[in-house]
Every structure is written in structure tokens, then in C-alpha cells.
Amino acid sequence: MRTQVAIIGSGPSGLLLGQLLAGIGVETIILERSSREHVLGRVRAGVLEQGTVDLLGEAGAAGRLHAEGLPHSGISLAFDGRLHRIDLTALTGGRHVTVYGQTEVTHDLMDKREAAGSVTVYETSKVALHDFDGASPFVTYDKDGATHRIDCDFIAGCDGYHGVSRRSAPEGALKTFERQYPFGWLGVLAQVPPADPELVYANHERGFALCSMRSPQRSRYYVQVPADERVEAWSDERFWDELRRRLPPRTAAAVTTGPSFEKSIAPLRSFVAEPMRFGRLFLVGDAAHIVPPTGAKGLNLAASDVRYLFAGLREFFSDRSQAGLDAYSAKALARVWKAVRFSWWMTTMLHRFPETGEFGQRIQEAELDYLVHSKAASTALAENYVGLPY
């Protein structure tokens, strides 16, 4: 087989890149190690920057997003028993975020790809990337007991933190930066109305909590737990009790409890790999960087990577210029590091760190108090939360 761009990974970044390229007549084949059902079953992020929404619109995949997504003009920080609202729209000249689950984004993009007849090969194994340091890269993989080969012009590694793409970088060519946090997020999905119409980020002596949502009838809640905690130790009753303890009284009283239909613990880490380009192989999204979910940046960073890579590929296929591709890694990493900083800052401000003790708690309290009473500080948070410019 031959295609112009081989895309490794059928998550949102791979699908989005494929749709954008299809719109300018560039052919792609996507290879995915999991089944279609497994990809659609992943529960992930739910807050989209306006730039991500715009890019999905450019890809022709924002119809349901515009109809069902929930525009949010603010968030609340909860501490000292009270809610303190940050007016994102007023502080950023009219910008906002949209709540729409990553599962839905994936579904929309997958439907568009399938309707167009573009090729995605699911349940592949032994994917290997070859000769991307030259002009004729190719990819091999196994499927149904046979080995297959795809010749291509470029390879886009959109296969996440555990994928083959980053591991294929030449030995010694990759530099990584990592911070692992001593806690995780225990999250539940429940078919109950949210406690607040906007997201609530709570700093509490028992640990962080987040009130979020996927729709007006579906809520997503999280509580900070130790890194070695086991999800089996948490009944629904225990979770709801702990969540309400960490929220201000009025917010806690507004929590509607019910059976969870998804419950999991996610570790928190900051991770960046540099560079994001190796010849004709480009790393995209979680293949190159991971951020703690506190700043709602993971999916949005993947989308901004796609935006930069799409621009470079469009320039190459229309003008045979490599200038955009040559600039990809530096442009992407400049935005990545700002989001890594913001996500780290939100995480350190809102979570309990076992090693910092009472001093750390007082520093957090002082920072939060300054933040909500300073327009300059609130503006800095709002600008980062709605998404920095490309």
C-alpha cells in the first residue's frame, strides 16, 4: 500500500489530522492497535479551548459540538468554605471554553472519516517505523497473521505516551523532562445533574476536588487520592461522602448522588520529549507531552500540535516548501511548555502535597487569596485557561 501520510493512532489527534488533510486532498492511512470499540470507550478530557473548537470546525466535524457543547464563561475556585468565580469571558475580551467530552470528539471525527471512505486499520500489532530519516519512509505492521507495508511521504506519531512513535526516535536524539506527582485523581461518571453550572476547583485540607460535567444530565467528579490508591477501595457511597466533605457547604448540598457507571484512578505527571520531529517522523500530542489534567490542556495541546503540523504539511504538498515542517517542533514546543507551566501551577496551587506540610498549605491559601482579589492575577489564569494564542 501507499499513502501520503501514515498516521499512527486513531485518537482525536490522529483523526483530526486525517480530516484536515482529507479536506485538502491529501491521502492518509491510520493504524490503530486497539479495536474501534475500545477507542470509543476511552473516558478522557471534556474542556475545549476556542482554538480547538475552531479547528474541529475547519475539519467539518463540529456540527454536534455546536449543537450539544456547553459554552462556559467562567470557573470557580473553592477554598476557605466559599466559591470565588473567575469570569473568563470578561477577563479575556469575550473568549470562553466549551464543555464537550473527548469521547464525543472522537466519535464525530471517526464518523466523518468513515463516511468519506478513508482507511483506518484497527487491531494492528508489531507496528514499526522505517527510514524516516530519508525521503522514503515506510511503516510495517501485522494484521490477521500477515505482515503489511505502507510506503508514505511522512509519518505522524499520534499514538500516545505508550505508543511506538516516540520509542522509534534514534538513540540519543531524544531529551525528556518529567515530574511525577505523589497523588492521582479518582474520577467517577454518573448520570446525575452537575452540582454547579460551571467547573468548581476545590482546595481543601483533605485534598483537591473537582466538579465537572459532560452534559446537563451527566456529571464528572474527581477527588485527589494517594498515588498507590486502588479504585476497588472506593464504593460509590465512600466517594460521594468524601467529595462533599471537600466542597463548600452550598456546593456540597447541590451534589446529586447516584450510581457511577465509570470509576477510575489516573496518575498525574508532567512530561515533555524534545524535539518533536525526526526527519519525516513527527510526534503529536501525548506521544510527545503529558500534562496533569488540572489545567484542562491535554486534548487542547494535541489539537495545537495538529494545527502546526497540518499547516506545515499543507505548505509542503501545495508549494513543495519544507519551511513549515522545519518550524514544527520549535513552534509546538513553545506552546507546549507554556501549557506545562500552567498545568503545573494549577496543580501545585490546588492539591495537598504530603511533603510541604502546614507551610505549604499557608502558601496555597495566600496564593489563592491573592489570585481572586487581583485582576492582574485573575487575568493571567483566565488567559491560560481559555488558551494562549497559536
Regions found by a protein language model. Name each.
Residues 1-5:
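Extreme N-terminal starter segment of soluble prokaryotic enzymes
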Residues 8-23, 109, 264-341, 345:
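Conserved mid-domain beta->alpha element of the FAD-binding
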Residues 22-43:
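Glycine-rich FAD pyrophosphate-binding loop
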Residues 38, 159-160, 291:
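Glycine-rich, N-terminal phosphate-binding loop of Rossmann-like dinucleotide-binding domains
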Residues 41-44, 49-116, 130:
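Active-site-adjacent segment of FAD-dependent monooxygenases/related oxidoreductases
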Residues 66-71, 123, 247-262, 320-327, ...:
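Acidic/histidine metal-binding catalytic segments
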Residues 111, 118-268, 273:
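Conserved FAD-binding catalytic core of PHBH/FMO-like flavoproteins
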Residues 296, 311-390:
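C-terminal helical "tail/cap" subdomain of flavin- and related membrane-associated enzymes
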